[in-house]
UniProtKB/Swiss-Prot annotation:
GO biological process terms held by the UniProt record: cell division; protein folding; protein transport; regulation of DNA-templated transcription elongation
Keyword set, alphabetical order: Cell cycle, Cell division, Chaperone, Cytoplasm, Isomerase, Rotamase
Record's function text: Involved in protein export. Acts as a chaperone by maintaining the newly synthesized protein in an open conformation. Functions as a peptidyl-prolyl cis-trans isomerase.
NCBIfam families: tig (TIGR00115)
Cellular component annotations (GO), alphabetically ordered: cytoplasm
Designated name of the protein: Trigger factor
Coiled coil: none
Family: Belongs to the FKBP-type PPIase family. Tig subfamily.
Length: 425
């Protein structure tokens, strides 16, 4: 086999493969053995048809099988090339005693990463977020520790109503009976709950609903109406929440720590997402238009196989507009992935087996399995292991880059005009 580079366009390389007579004959032998097990030629026993008879009877079909077996030899020659997609065979033929293939290979494109400090990510003002969090949690605790007093009068805003709900079908059969408690809120519009306003103990409300063409009757009986008295925000509330607290300030401090833990996790994730979204802005890439066009067509073919293409293309002015959008997204995705890979290599960022195990343990509850089972799965399944390794690597690289980006502190949503900037850091 001889391999020659015919053409290079950035990451796209066109290679010519030429197989000699011995290699072609060997591939013909493989094709003959393969076909002997699958075709029947009149006058010959199955599996006993001579190669020359198969060549004569099958003609071009035999040649195609021979070319297929030769094609199987090509991937091994590409192992040292990092390919972004499968090789594309543009020509293949057997001429006289040799076979010739022309193959397009699309390597991972080279990237150059610019000044990451030009990327701006937003960070919501920590003090204001925690202040709002503490206020909200204190209100939650007031609600949780409300004093309940049965009342004779009708249910009104702020009251808690305990009901039994019976559901009947069209034939009058009782399908279920359950008890519920609802707190009636200002501007109440929840189904059933709004129908309880003004009702007293022992009152009955019947409501008809239709689901999937069937009618159901809901019979709500008011078991009890309670007037709720919310405790004042003060030292007494703190002691009620936890007898280890003596003062409101101690409770607030604990709530602030609780909020800080949530804030740190959610804000770090938000900043990672912002950075990842903007990373392509500082990445220069050497990629062939042919590569992008093939990847776009590959995506369109997949959407068609999944039956989603018509719905998606209908949201664009034309197929060309869809292709433009897909091309941009694919290019940005390649920039992101290549940048992560290059930075990880340059800065010696790696993922250890211990980190993989820890990640598996943390994901186990979401997978609905035990931590030990999760770790075993990661060890036994290479695809899962590589997916996790990439997720961890990407997170570690982004965290490194977050130390270099420009961070803009902004007001929490709903605070001021929602866009006010506090400054840079």
């Amino acid at each position: 086999m001889e391999v020659k580079e015919l053409e290079r366009d950035k990451n796209r390389v066109v290679l010519e493969y030429v197989f000699n007579r011995e290699e072609v004959l060997e591939a013909e032998d493989k094709a003959a053995r393969y076909l002997n097990q699958r075709v029947e030629i009149p006058g010959f026993r199955k599996g006993r048809v001579p190669k020359n008879i198969l060549k004569m009877r099958l003609g071009e079909d035999f040649q195609e099988y021979t070319l297929d077996f030769l094609m199987d030899l090509i991937p091994d020659t590409l192992k040292d090339r990092n390919l972004i997609m499968s090789p594309v065979v543009t020509e293949r033929e057997i001429k006289e005693d040799t076979a010739r293939f022309v193959v397009e290979v699309h390597e991972e494109p080279e990237v150059k990463i610019g000044d990451v400090s030009k990327i701006e990510v937003e960070k919501v003002d920590e003090e204001k977020v925690l202040e709002k969090y503490v206020e909200r949690r204190l209100e939650d605790l007031r609600e949780k520790h409300a004093l309940l007093e049965p009342k004779e009068g009708p249910a009104e805003v702020g009251d808690l109503v305990r009901i039994s709900m019976e559901v009947y079908n069209e034939e009058g059969k009782n399908l279920t009976t359950r008890e519920y408690e609802y707190v009636i809120k200002e501007g109440e519009d929840r189904p059933f709950v709004k129908d309880l306003i003004g009702k007293k103990k022992d009152d009955v409300v019947e409501i008809e609903r239709e689901y999937e063409g069937k009618k159901y009757t809901y019979r709500l009986k008011v078991q009890e109406v309670y007037r709720r008295t919310l405790p004042e925000i003060g030292d007494e509330l703190a002691r009620t929440v936890n007898n280890e607290f003596e003062t409101l300030e101690q409770l607030k401090e604990e709530l602030k720590k609780e909020g800080k833990d949530i804030y740190d996790v959610e804000m770090k994730e938000s900043m990672r997402e912002q950075l990842l979204e903007k990373l392509p802005e500082v990445v220069e890439i050497e990629i062939s238009e042919r590569t992008l066009d093939l990847l776009v067509q590959e995506t369109i073919n997949r959407l068609k196989r999944e039956g989603r293409y018509d719905q998606i293309v209908s949201s664009y002015e034309s197929e060309e507009k869809l292709k433009e959008e897909l091309k941009k997204r694919i290019l940005d995705d390649i920039k992101r992935d290549r940048a992560i890979e290059v930075i990880a290599k340059e800065r010696n960022v790696d993922v250890s087996d211990e980190e993989l195990e820890k990640e598996a343990e943390e994901l186990a509850p979401f997978w609905g399995i035990s931590p030990e089972r999760a770790k075993s799965l990661v060890k036994s399944r290479r695809d899962l292991r590589e997916d996790l390794r990439w997720a961890i690597l990407k997170r570690k690289v982004l965290d490194l880059l977050l130390e270099e980006v420009t961070v803009k502190v902004v007001e929490p949503r709903g605070e001021g005009d929602g866009d006010e900037r506090k400054g840079d850091n």
